[in-house]
Curated annotation (Swiss-Prot):
Family annotation (Pfam families): RNA_pol_Rpb1_1, RNA_pol_Rpb1_2, RNA_pol_Rpb1_3, RNA_pol_Rpb1_4, RNA_pol_Rpb1_5
Cofactor(s) this protein requires: Mg(2+); Zn(2+)
Species of origin: Herpetosiphon aurantiacus (strain ATCC 23779 / DSM 785 / 114-95)
Protein name stated in the entry: DNA-directed RNA polymerase subunit beta'
Note describing how the cofactor binds: Binds 1 Mg(2+) ion per subunit.
Keywords linked to the UniProt accession: DNA-directed RNA polymerase, Magnesium, Metal-binding, Nucleotidyltransferase, Transcription, Transferase, Zinc
Organismal lineage: Bacteria, Bacillati, Chloroflexota, Chloroflexia, Herpetosiphonales
Length: 1543
């Protein structure tokens, strides 16, 4: 087993398969858990005894070996080792995966580490891992080149063939066309010939017919005959029947024949033309068809060539796609496989990715990325930087990238994922078992399928399912739908076991349930002393049972523990006496949840009481924030002697009187006690016995006892004591009787005498004795709550000063606490005890006189003032007038609303004044309110005056007031309105309490490693504290408890008030306040005190004492080891919750402020968010111009004007060549010599600008004007006027500044001051006082990192966040080697971001985003040096804080020195001096350790076996081993047990 005190750092990294196998005790091959009949684990299953160890101590599975004597034997029958069953909590198993599986954290994380390393997008990577896409894992470049060349050749051949084919086709077409055209010509010729022949025949017919008719006519002419019938020629009648034939008829005939011939000729020509036209048309058609065919062939050729070229290009492009790590779809894979077989390998799933990752050369990749970071810009540079960060993480950590892919899956021990039997016989099991079962089932099925050579698609699907099963086991729900169990509840994976409030970190490591604890309701214990609590007997008996049993055996009441247990269980009378004895030695711790600050757990001496409730001292209620309305508290018993000692010295209530947040007393009396003391110190004129005179205090008390004088009657008494300033009655000094003790005749009351007597303690020196003056001298004034608080504070402060303690008393303290206890601790113990006794006396006095005074009140004591109705009626009239004005249009509705609200607020205030005036000052109501015991004027106003205005749920004031009060009773509408505010209070309480708790948690996380580690960091820087109107606290309050950096002098007299390195005490603060009063306003504003601050502390880890100053809880300088970060976080967070709850108590009645604004503002400040209502800041320094444009747009323009001048003297005999006011450029001629041959150079302009001639000088003036313009919102209220001069970063509009913008404009110091002041504004406005230093601690943590801009010669990366001190260390080392340092800019981180970016991965992982933090830490191989508190609590070590830290440091250094001395002595003591020493001793002596850390490392690593062989501790061990034949123990090297006990 690893001993937790033997290491001081812890490293996290990726586990290799070999590591996982080395952890494992066997392979889990079956999904079975336990046998349903025998209820014993199944062999090789998830609970296998052979792998994980026996379920019963010292017994193997089969029962062959039983008892401890067989320890270590492995049973030959069942294979189970005989050992303790608790090994089942740490023995691991493993599952050998049939196929590699990716770890989901490194795939789905942001950013994806695997994706960045391979330069694959997370989406594509996921597709590969889940078998949706292929990734090319190997490429044969030679084969691919051959395929490419072959492809080009093939396409060349195809192209040539295609071209030849087209040429051939075109030739064929041309030949066919020429043949067709020749045939057409021949056909046309034939047609023409036939036409000619036809027309020749027709002509012949005409001629023949004409000749025949001519002859016939000639015959008829010859005989003068008449036509025997109509003579017709071709349809035309030449002669009708019986008409004589003459010559004219022949002429007519000839004419007709000519006409016929002409017609025939025309027809012939027409026919020939037609034939020709038809032939030409057909020819043209054939030609165009042929041309179109040729065109089509040409187009087809071009298209085919284009297609061929495209196909070639596509195929070549596809070949180009065959690149290593290319993601391709299944379809693309098939195409490429067909295209270029045997040239590449592609695969899918985690196995493919593992092959690729294992081949990555990290060194080469790192060089590439660094070159890209330096050469690129913008997004490319950003991406390269991200990749470089991951690559460098793997290089430096020694992790191998392929370990992100698992081949072996570890199985966690079975007792961490138990299976338990329930009452009904059913079993409840951890969800992890179901998740493991799914993995094993799928893994076994995959193995079987692979053995059977199943089809690829089935195997692939099974691999994907295995991947999903492992994903669900590691982080269920990170990808896809979460795996659900029975009842649809999401199964809890390993990641779920770690993260969140119920996770391992927060549930089991940072907070554990403890034994020896109990819980009960609390009741008040008015008779208890401050250090006591009442513990019920039954509870105490149970808590201290083992101790009582032991004591019973010791005393002989029982013979053994068993009988003693029976004795206790029967509750015999002797048990109570023994319990009383036992309990005397023990303190118990009381805790009230929620534990908001360290005073929520305090130690008390237990006082046995009857009953079942714990009794609590009334004065510690404020620290616990407890009341007695049913609150419960837990009791814990510190067991060890050291725990008891710590409880007695550190945690007992007596030593926790002051609040760590403010330094004010936290055990202030309240309620009944305040009322009793107030009643006691009140003087009532006219009371019985008023005006009587007494010679001494005893006389007056006697008179009171005999009823002669009322306790509040004003009487004259002679007292021998100092009277403190502030007396409210008359007094007269009398001569001292002994010349030392003062005597005064004062007007006072018997009550005040009783009160002042209670303040004195037995053995206190007399007033004036040896100059003794204490703040507990006679108080002759009214004492209320604030008076009692001041009294306790004064008492503590007075008794914590060494000069105020009598020598004998101081000597007693030394004897009691031991001479090793520091003076500061002694003073703290003494002051605390004295103050605690005083508080107890005041408590008793207050309770007694509150009871004797009989203070109570009834409804009749609450008197309604007579003027109330008149005020209300007058306000109603005012409101009517306002509404009339609005109806007339004189005012807007918003103005009407504001006026009405103002009128009612005024009325409420008037009535409040009247209520106060009508109250009887000696009445119980007035006394309770005035004294601060209970209630305030506002509540009395609601009871006796009027409730006033209330708010609605949005926070807006309802303008209808509640004019009634509780004495009179509310009407229905008034009651309804008042419920609005009341409900808002309750809702706020519920919502904001969670917010305040979460804020506290974040604050604790960010500041948990701020511990006081050194005395002085040696810084010369600090912060100025000046008078400021913005800061509500006074300079006096802000400087007390701080240490000066520089001397402080009085500006008037010049005297040095403080030297450097002086602690400023309360009296010094008052002195400064007096100095400030003596100065005028200007001098006050200039006067400042330069003090140390945690903001400027130079300590490498934690902070130094001087920068922190006073520990407010003790009133002394902080001790080394104090966890001031936690105190700061608690101090800020605790009042946040208080403020949250406070809205509820005012009943929702309208007040000016509400924490609803306050708490979100605090979160805004500490998270460094852009605030709501962001103010405009001046980006440059200059003069403001307010530009108002049309449409109401306002612009703020800042004009920065710089004037540069260049002045040149004009020598004699020089002529100016420029005019006055001319614009000139650099190098322009201004003047030259007018003497011929003069060798003097001309004057030229050295500056571009306007030139001015001034007698014997030439002046050039240049203006550099810079402008910046902002558009201002309509609603924004300006803080600047036109023409104002503003500085960079100055706020120009009302609102809150953006701290990030302020950091850029004004730098680190301005932001520190702004954040501190803004946080304080919120708290102080709510009446909560927190010391500045607590806020400064948080702000320091927010600003402790810087962002690298230029890495120089360092190994840092651009954009990396590093701690400022770490950067300074790295730069100093680089500069000393002659390199260039890194350049960085300050960064302001919100508390959440700052917590997560801490150096400790344990702290960050236990805060938020557990899986992301652990992923990053594992990849980087981060080392956690366990410097903070959380990380040490997580691993169970002592935290590096507390009073023992310094002693442990010294002890370690002494041990290192002792070992160094051992190693420096000769190896063989008997060797004479003359004999040369062995070779080993001739080496130089080891140097003693230089630092505490080095010494501690040495001490804690003595037996680890990890250090080098010549290490000084290794030598020491070797020497002791050689001398004594054994290894030295740790205590021998560290010192004796007694030394350790003294620590």
């Amino acid at each position: 087993m690893l001993e937790i005190n033997e290491f001081n750092a812890i490293r996290i990294s990726l586990a290799s398969p070999e590591d996982i196998l080395s952890w494992s005790h066997g392979e889990v091959t079956k999904p079975e858990t336990i046998n349903y009949r025998t209820l014993r684990p199944e062999r090789d299953g998830l609970f296998c005894e052979k792998i994980f160890g026996p379920t019963r101590d010292w017994e193997c599975y089969c029962g062959k070996y039983k008892r401890v004597r067989y320890k270590g034997i492995v049973c030959d029958k069942c294979g189970v080792e005989v050992t303790r069953s608790k090994v089942r909590r740490d023995r691991m198993g493993h599952i050998k995966l049939a196929s590699p599986v990716s770890h989901i954290w490194f795939v789905k994380g942001t950013p994806s580490r695997l994706g960045l390393l391979l330069d694959i997008s997370p989406r594509n990577l996921e597709r590969v891992l889940y078998f949706a896409s292929y990734i090319i894992t190997d490429v044969d470049d030679l084969a691919l080149g051959n395929v490419r060349e072959q492809m080009k050749t093939d396409f060349g051949v195809r192209r040539k063939d295609l071209e030849e084919k087209i040429i051939e086709q075109r030739g064929e077409k041309a030949t066919r066309l020429s043949k067709d055209l020749a045939a057409m010509d021949n056909a046309m010729e034939g047609t023409l010939e036939r036409t000619h022949e036809q027309f020749a025949r027709q002509r012949q017919e005409i001629e023949d017919e004409a000749n025949a008719l001519r002859e016939h006519l000639e015959e008829l002419i010859g005989i003068d005959a008449l036509a025997d019938e109509d003579i017709v020629y071709r349809g035309t009648v030449l002669l009708e029947e019986n008409e004589p034939v003459r010559e004219r008829s022949l002429e007519q005939l000839e004419q007709l024949i000519d006409q016929e011939r002409e017609k025939l000729e025309q027809r012939r020509e027409y026919e020939i033309e037609n034939v020709r036209l038809l032939a030409d048309g057909e020819r043209d058609q054939r030609q165009s068809v042929a041309d179109a065919e040729q065109e089509r062939l040409t187009t087809a050729l071009i298209k085919q060539l284009e297609d061929l070229n495209k196909e070639e290009k596509d195929k070549l492009d596809r070949l180009d796609d065959i690149q290593l790590h290319r993601i391709i779809s299944e379809n693309e894979y098939r195409i490429l496989r067909d295209l270029a077989p045997y040239t590449f390998k592609a695969d899918m799933g985690a196995g493919a990715v593992r092959d690729i990752v294992s081949m990555v050369d990290l060194d080469e990749l790192s060089n590439q990325m660094q070159a890209e970071v330096q050469s690129s810009s913008g997004q490319r540079r950003k991406k390269a930087t991200k990749r470089l960060r991951v690559v460098e993480a793997f290089r430096k950590s020694g992790n191998r990238p392929e370990w992100m892919i698992m081949t072996v899956l570890p199985v966690i021990p079975p007792d961490l994922r138990p299976m338990v039997q329930l009452d009904g016989g059913r079993f409840a099991t951890s969800d992890l078992n179901d998740l493991y079962r799914r993995v094993i089932n799928r893994n076994n099925r995959l193995k079987r399928l692979m053995e059977l050579n199943a089809p690829e698609i089935i195997v692939r699907n099974e691999k994907r399912m295995l991947q999903e099963a492992v994903d669900a086991l590691i982080d269920n729900g990170r990808r896809g739908r979460p795996v659900s169990g029975k009842g649809k509840h999401r199964l809890k994976s390993l990641s779920d076991m770690l993260k969140g409030k119920q996770g391992r970190f927060r549930q089991n490591l940072l907070g554990k349930r403890v034994d020896y604890s109990g819980r009960s309701v609390i009741v008040v214990g008015p008779t208890l002393q401050l250090h006591q609590c009442g513990l019920p007997k039954k509870m105490a008996l149970e808590l201290f049972k083992p101790f009582v049993m032991r004591r019973l055996v010791d005393k002989g009441f029982a013979h053994n523990i068993k009988s003693a247990k029976r004795f206790v269980e029967r509750v015999r009378p002797e048990v109570w006496d023994v319990l009383e004895e036992v309990i005397k030695d023990y303190l118990v711790l009381l805790n009230r949840a929620p534990s908001l600050h360290r005073l929520s757990i305090q130690a008390f001496e237990a006082k046995l009481i009857e009953g079942s409730a714990i009794q609590l001292h009334p004065l510690v209620c404020a620290a616990f924030n407890a009341d007695f309305d049913g609150d419960q508290m837990a009791v814990h018993v510190p067991l060890s002697r050291k725990a008891q000692e710590e409880a007695r010295r550190r945690m007992i209530s007596t030593y926790n009187l002051l609040s760590p947040a403010t330094g004010d007393p936290i055990i202030t009396p309240s309620q009944d006690i305040v009322l009793g003391c107030f009643y006691l110190t009140q003087v009532r004129p006219g009371a019985k016995g008023g005006g009587k005179r007494f010679g001494s205090i005893d006389e007056a008390l006697l008179a009171y006892t005999n009823g002669v004088v009322h306790i509040q009657a004003p009487v004259w008494i002679v007292i021998e004591d100092y009277i403190l300033p502030g007396s409210d009655l008359r007094e007269k000094e009398l001569p001292s009787l002994d010349g030392v003790t003062p005597r005064v005749l004062i007007e006072t009351s018997v009550g005040r005498i009783i009160f002042n007597n209670a303040l004195r303690y037995q053995g206190e020196p007399k007033a004036g004795e040896n100059g003794y003056r204490s703040p507990l001298h006679y108080r002759n004034f009214l004492v209320g709550k604030s008076g009692l608080k001041a009294l306790i504070a004064d008492c503590y402060r007075f008794h914590s000063q060494r000069e105020n303690i009598i020598a004998d008393v101081y000597q007693e303290l030394i004897e009691r606490f031991g001479p090793e206890t520091s003076e500061e601790s002694l003073l703290r113990f003494y002051a605390s005890e004295r103050t605690a006794r005083l508080a107890d006396r005041i408590k008793a006095l207050g309770f007694k006189h509150a009871t004797l005074g009989g203070m109570t009140f009834s409804a009749s004591d609450v008197e309604v003032p007579d003027t109330k109705d008149a005020i209300v009626q007058e306000t109603y009239k005012k409101v009517q007038d306002i509404e009339k004005m609005q109806r007339r249009g004189l005012i807007t509705d918003d103005e009407r609303y504001r006026e009405v609200v103002t009128a009612w607020l005024d009325a409420t205030n008037q009535i409040k004044v009247e209520v106060q005036r009508s109250l009887n000052p000696f009445g119980p109501v007035s006394m309770m309110s005035t004294s601060g015991a209970r209630g305030n004027v506002e509540q009395i106003r609601q009871m006796a005056g009027m409730r006033g205005l209330t708010t609605d749920p949005t926070g807006r004031i309802i303008e209808l007031p509640i004019t009634a009060n509780f004495r009179e009773g509310l009407s229905v509408i008034e009651y309804f309105i008042s419920t609005h505010g009341g409900r808002k209070g309750l809702a706020d309480t519920a919502l904001r309490t969670a917010d305040a708790g979460y804020l506290t948690r974040r604050l604790v996380d960010v500041a948990q490693d701020v511990i006081v580690t050194i005395e002085d960091c040696g810084t010369t820087e600090g912060m100025w504290i000046r008078v400021s109107r913005d800061i509500l606290a006074s300079v006096e309050d802000r400087i007390v408890g701080r240490v000066t950096v520089a001397p402080v002098t009085n500006p008037v007299t010049g005297e040095v008030i403080f030297d450097t390195d002086s602690e400023i005490l309360e009296d010094d603060g008052k002195h400064i306040a007096n100095v400030l009063k003596s100065l005028d306003k200007e001098a006050q504003a200039e006067f400042g005190i330069y003090v140390r601050s945690v903001l400027t502390c130079n300590a490498d880890y934690g902070i130094c004492r001087k920068c922190y100053g006073r520990n407010l809880a003790t009133g002394k300088m902080v001790e080394i080891g104090e966890a001031v970060g936690i105190i700061a976080a608690q101090s800020i967070g605790e009042p946040g919750t208080q403020l949250t709850l406070r809205t509820f108590h005012t009943g929702g009645v309208a007040t000016d402020t509400d924490i609803t604004q306050g708490l979100p503002r605090v979160q805004e400040i500490f998270e460094a968010r852009i605030p709501k209502g962001k103010a405009v800041l001046a980006q440059i320094a200059g003069r403001v111009q307010i530009v108002r444009e049309e449409e109401g747009i306002r612009r703020l323009r800042i004009v920065s004007e710089e004037v540069y001048t260049d002045e040149q003297m004009l020598p004699k005999d020089y002529r100016v060549v420029v005019k006055n006011g001319d614009a000139v450029e650099i190098g322009n001629l201004l003047a030259e010599s007018n003497v011929d041959g003069d060798g003097r150079a001309p004057l030229v302009a050295g500056l571009a600008g306007n030139v001015y001639v001034d007698d014997d000088r030439l002046v050039i003036q240049a203006k550099d004007i810079e402008e910046h313009e902002e558009v201002i919102a309509h609603a924004a209220r300006l803080r600047v006027k036109d023409g104002d001069l503003v500085q960079v970063g100055q706020q120009m509009t009302e609102g809150s500044s953006d701290p990030q913008e302020m950091l850029q404009l004004r730098g680190r110091e301005a932001v520190q001051e702004y954040l501190t002041n803004e946080a304080q504004k919120v708290y102080r406005s709510q009446g909560v006082g927190i010391n500045d230093k607590h806020i400064e601690v948080i702000v320091r943590q927010m600003l402790r990192r810087v962002r690298i801009e230029e890495p120089g010669d360092t190994e840092l990366l651009p954009g990396e966040l590093v701690e400022l001190h770490e950067l300074n260390r790295i730069n100093a080392s680089i500069v000393s080697q002659g390199g260039d340092p890194a350049l960085a800019v300050p960064v302001l981180l919100g508390i959440t971001k700052a917590s997560l970016s801490t150096d400790s991965f344990l702290s960050a992982a236990s805060f938020q985003e557990t899986t992301r933090v652990l992923t990053e830490a594992a990849v980087n191989g981060k080392i956690d040096y366990l410097r903070g508190l959380k990380e040490n609590v997580v691993i169970g070590k002592l935290i590096p804080a507390g009073t023992g830290m310094e002693q442990r440091r010294k002890l370690a250094e002494e041990a290192a020195l002792r070992v160094a001395q051992i190693t420096s002595t000769p190896a063989d003591r008997e060797v004479p001096a003359a004999t040369p020493a062995p070779a080993v001793m001739s080496e130089p002596k080891p140097a003693p350790p230089r630092s505490f850390d080095e010494a501690l490392n040495a001490v804690t690593n003595i037996d680890s076996g990890n250090g080098p062989k010549d290490d000084l501790f290794a030598q020491a061990m070797a020497r002791l081993q050689a001398e004594e034949g054994r290894k030295p123990t740790l205590s021998e090297l560290l010192g004796t047990d007694e030394d350790e006990e003294n620590v």
